[in-house]
From Swiss-Prot:
NCBIfam families: bioB. Keywords: 2Fe-2S, 4Fe-4S, Biotin biosynthesis, Iron, Iron-sulfur, Metal-binding, S-adenosyl-L-methionine, Transferase. It catalyses: (4R,5S)-dethiobiotin + (sulfur carrier)-SH + 2 reduced [2Fe-2S]-[ferredoxin] + 2 S-adenosyl-L-methionine = (sulfur carrier)-H + biotin + 2 5'-deoxyadenosine + 2 L-methionine + 2 oxidized [2Fe-2S]-[ferredoxin]. SMART domains: BATS (SM00876), Elp3 (SM00729). This is Biotin synthase. The lineage of its organism: Bacteria, Pseudomonadati, Chlorobiota, Chlorobiia, Chlorobiales.
């Protein structure tokens, strides 16, 4: 017998209309075997409104500039305010990016993201000009590849330039419920600066990839608050990360979320965003371990493959086989 909150949530499957905030909070209190019923509903909603296996979204990223970031994000190994042991380097060469992008194409990945550490760019600097050149070269030499970017907070001029250079998606995460950003993530910039960047991107018709990170000390209600806040941003992709505690950061001793809590979060995200690509990013392999397959049957229709900015991921070939096996559940 279905839990009444899940039974009520089946209207999302029938109508395609998302949960209300109150309904999402009710589902957030579920536990035990009810979570499998919730996952089943989320999977059905994903298949009906966000496409089947053929629309599964896999992407790879490259850390093109690493470390020495002046922002004090509490979870991040690249912040100079933290003491994580990572490789530090300035912006890499165009050739280095091209090699990584070619490998992504060879692996059958359709989207490739260039990522840089740092606050962002309020104007077009010489470094930003180099990034634009990288984008142009990838378009020229790998025309089948969707080139994406994540360069931090952007002003009007850099956003307009990215639009002119044909960027496919721009990633900038909200991370947590906006009114908790300075408490849980960073004090050197605000959630409002990120939201302003998203609005600029959408004004220039750039598709936005924006999600967050769970397990950083937020309450269950605040976790739902993040998912609700994302509804107002007109997003193409929602990547959700599960905190991977990194030594040398303020969150290194954080208690990891249970697989059940992660499952519940992703399933509720699908019911709040029936038509959006929902991507499992960091934490899929390291935090979910044996349960990551279950997550992919709980409304998720995309993942990051081949590794993250400062942590390793699973082999792309293994992920391709994994994605193909999901077709059995469509």
């Amino acid at each position: 017998m279905l839990h009444p909150a899940i039974e009520s949530a089946y209207r999302v499957l029938a109508t395609g209309e998302p949960l209300t905030h109150g309904e999402a909070l009710q589902l957030a209190n579920l536990s035990g075997s009810d979570l499998l019923d919730l996952a089943s509903l989320a999977h059905k909603v994903q298949l009906r409104y966000a496409g089947g296996v053929e629309s599964f979204h896999a992407c790879s990223i490259m850390n093109a500039k690493s470390g020495v970031c002046g922002e004090n994000c509490r979870f991040c190994a690249q912040s100079k305010h933290n003491n994580a042991a990572i490789e530090v380097y300035d912006l890499v060469s165009d050739d280095s990016v091209l090699i990584e992008a070619r490998q992504a194409v060879a692996n059958g990945v359709s989207h490739f993201g260039i990522v840089t550490s740092g606050y962002g760019y309020q104007r077009i600097t010489p470094e930003f000009e180099r990034l634009l050149g990288m984008i142009d070269r990838l378009h020229s030499e790998l025309p089948s590849l969707n080139v994406c970017a994540s360069f931090g907070v952007l002003g009007e001029e850099p956003v307009a330039a990215l639009a002119a250079h044909g960027i496919a998606h721009y990633n900038i995460n909200l991370q947590v419920e906006p009114n908790r950003y300075n408490d849980l993530i960073a004090t050197t910039h605000s959630a409002e600066e990120r939201i302003a960047t998203i609005h600029r991107l959408r004004q220039h018709n750039i598709a936005v990839c924006c999600g967050g990170i769970i397990g950083v000390g937020e309450s269950v209600e605040e976790r739902i608050g993040l998912l609700i806040a994302l509804q107002a941003l007109d997003l193409a992709v929602i990547p959700l990360n599960v905190l991977v505690p990194i030594a040398g950061t303020p969150l290194e001793k954080s208690e990891p979320l249970s697989a059940a809590e992660v499952l519940k979060t992703f399933a509720i995200c699908r019911l709040l965003h029936p038509r959006t690509i929902i991507k499992f990013a960091a934490g899929r392999e390291t935090m979910m371990k044996d349960f990551q397959g279950l997550l992919m049957l709980a409304g998720v229709n995309g993942f990051l493959t081949g590794g993250y900015l400062t942590t390793r991921g699973r082999d792309v070939a293994d992920d391709q086989r994994f994605a193909a096996q999901l077709a059995s559940f469509a």
